[in-house]
Amino acid sequence: LSIRRQRQMCIRGRPISKARTIVGCAGTFTTLSALAQGLERYDADAIHGSELRFDALRVLLQQLISLPSDVRALNPVIHPGRADVIGGGAVAVEGIMQLIERNCDARSFFISEKDILDGIIAGLAAEGTPR
């Protein structure tokens, strides 16, 4: 499937037209937040709950995409295993921003250090499901 087709499927499955808050979770989003804040080291407390406005994020994404992975790897907030893949993540985030802009009024991401595994665990705990 093309990326465009996958985005269309996402919108049909979960309409976002009424969304006011968009949360970016873990991975690329937390790295982008650290970069946007100019952190000298990765700081989960500074990242969790931070806001990335689309206008500023677009500038950061273009800068990041233009850097070769060996230069990205020199930045202490970019995990060594992410330096070569963060460019692809940046392209994906740009696509997500475009999707959001076309379908709702939100113009920023709020960043969460928590990821899908945290959500699954919280859901199971709420259900009282033993594992």
Regions found by a protein language model. Give the residues of each.
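Helical "lid/coupling" subdomains associated with nucleotide-phosphate turnover
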Residues: 4-8, 12-131
